[in-house]
Amino acid sequence: MSGNYRHRLPLNALRAFEASARHLSFTRAGLELNVTQAAVSQQVRLLEEQLGLELFIRLPRGLALTDEGLALLPVLSRSFDQIESLLQQFEDGHYHEVLSVSVVGTFAVGWLLPRLPAFAALYPYIDLRIMTHNNVVNLAAEGVDFAIRFGEGLWPLAENTALFSAAHTVLCSEKVANKLTHPLDLKDHSLMRSYRKDEWEKWQIAAELEPWRVKGPIFDSSRLMVEAALLTDGVALAPSCMFEHELSAGTLVQPFDISVTLGGYWLSRLKSRPTTPAMAIFRHWLLAEVQK
């Protein structure tokens, strides 16, 4: 067998060999392929003749692979698995595509998750996989298609598209809010902090206060910070747009109409990553949702 023979590949014989090699039995291969044992044996023999070598050692009971058979089996098995996996992605007349998105946890719970049912209804053939992070994500190492994160959009080697800015304001329970009549009253309460060191100072300046040193636990998630504030009668400085449900329900209260913008939410992808159809669809859908 020589030259360009792709158009002459003995696919039936290759299938017969691959099944027989996995089972080390022509009989069990025939059951899998829904043909007779004799038909499988004949196909394997034809393949051996075409290759000019033996792929099996015929034993009194069963089969054993020759060195050539051992070399051929993993290549065929991998190829058939890939073909099967790809064909499964064409179910329902659509190409089913996996889309992986790494999302900062606060954005995932406060904004994205409530909207995902609508996305799934529009694009059932996109297998969306959501992974949460706390703003530290390596697009190259994690192999995700997109990351949604908070900051100023200055991440290198990435195409960063602004979604919306996020004004941070004081959030707490109604019990704590009843004790806050002036921003200076915050000095008497535990103030939760994030990894952004100057956020409380910026809010104090916006409130026309002389900044004071804030001491309190540090969190890497605004969602976790707010939960901690509710559990410990503390006060959080967090993006109110991510807690609209809790504010509407009265679980959270915004005691002061003072806010400060510390950054925004961004959609990021590696510049070197080719855009797939699913990526283009998700980006278009996400930006449309942001505009609503």
UniProtKB/Swiss-Prot annotation:
Cell compartments where the protein resides: Cytoplasm
The family assignment reads: Belongs to the LysR transcriptional regulatory family.
* Xref: PANTHER family: HTH-TYPE TRANSCRIPTIONAL ACTIVATOR AMPR, HTH-TYPE TRANSCRIPTIONAL REGULATOR
Q: What is its main location?
A: cytoplasm
Annotated DNA-binding ranges? 26-45
What's the superkingdom here? Bacteria
Q: Name one GO molecular function term.
A: DNA-binding transcription factor activity
Q: Which GO terms describe its cellular component?
A: cytoplasm
Any one of the GO BP annotations: DNA-templated transcription
Task: Enumerate the UniProt keywords alphabetically.
Answer: Activator, Cytoplasm, DNA-binding, Transcription, Transcription regulation
- Pfam families assigned: HTH_1, LysR_substrate
Supply the name of the protein. HTH-type transcriptional activator AmpR
Q: Which Gene3D superfamilies match?
A: Periplasmic binding protein-like II, Winged helix-like DNA-binding domain superfamily/Winged helix DNA-binding domain
In what residue span(s) does the HTH lysR-type domain sit?
Answer: 9-66
The record describes the protein's role as:
This protein is a positive regulator of gene expression of beta-lactamase (AmpC).
